């Protein structure tokens, strides 16, 4: 009887500890980052920031890439999975090459109007594609019978966060990303102001 009691007691104690440890590992948010070397996992700033926010960091930044690569990965379906699209709370874009990402002359009305794959000749068009495609994919979850956003009026709420470069010498990029953020109503992380 004593052994049975001790076994049951130990079972409940260890189960409680396991559950408590598992609960402490849960996160409130999931944030996906795309970018180049400044954002790559080796730098660690994104992962540290996510830990401070109690968020799961999904870092898809790759050194040497540009926004065209992000657009191409979206077109190929390799930037995020359907499950990740369903569950991420924000898409953070940190493609901070010193290029104009706001120039509107060659932008298309819909992301489907762009020819893929992208090259690096038009950063504004690639940014536009990434933004419009993400917004559309979130909206269209309302028509996906397997989505938790199925039959909702507007699909999944889409949050896109843009970033300046932390070095203020990237004037072309930093100025144009501010315009793009203001135009789209996107949150902007102003690294150049606070670093």
Residues covered by each model-derived region:
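Extracellular serine-dependent O-acyl
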Residues: 158-164, 172-195
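Short, flexible hinge/linker loops that cap or flank conserved catalytic cores
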Residues: 23-25, 154
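Serine-dependent acyl-ester chemistry module
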Residues: 98-121, 144-157, 165-175
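Conserved SGNH/GDSL esterase-like catalytic core that processes O-acyl groups on lipids
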Residues: 25-33, 38-125
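Sec-exported extracytoplasmic/periplasmic mature domains
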Residues: 54, 96, 132-140, 153-154, ...
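Sec-dependent N-terminal signal peptides
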Residues: 4-14
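Alpha-helical scaffolding within the catalytic cores
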Residues: 42-44, 70-86, 129, 133-136, ...
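Boundary at the C-terminal end of the N-terminal hydrophobic targeting segment
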Residues: 18-20
């Amino acid at each position: 009887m004593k052994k049975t009691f001790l076994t049951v007691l130990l079972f409940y104690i260890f189960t409680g500890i396991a559950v408590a440890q598992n609960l402490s590992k849960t996160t409130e948010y999931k944030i996906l980052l795309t970018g180049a070397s400044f954002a790559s996992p080796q730098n660690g700033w994104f992962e540290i920031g996510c830990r401070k926010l109690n968020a799961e960091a999904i870092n898809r930044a790759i050194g040497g890439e540009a926004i065209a690569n992000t657009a191409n990965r979206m077109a190929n379906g390799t930037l995020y999975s359907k499950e990740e699209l369903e569950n991420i709370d924000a898409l953070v874009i940190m493609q901070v090459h010193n290029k104009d990402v706001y120039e509107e002359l060659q932008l298309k009305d819909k992301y489907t109007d762009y020819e893929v794959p992208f090259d690096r000749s038009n950063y504004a068009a690639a940014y536009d594609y990434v933004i419009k495609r993400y917004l559309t994919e979130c909206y269209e979850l309302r028509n996906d019978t397997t989505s938790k956003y199925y039959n909702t009026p507007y699909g999944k709420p889409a949050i896109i966060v843009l970033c300046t470069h932390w070095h203020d010498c990237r004037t072309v990029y930093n100025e144009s990303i501010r315009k793009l953020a203001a135009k789209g109503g996107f949150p902007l992380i102003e690294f150049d102001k606070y670093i």
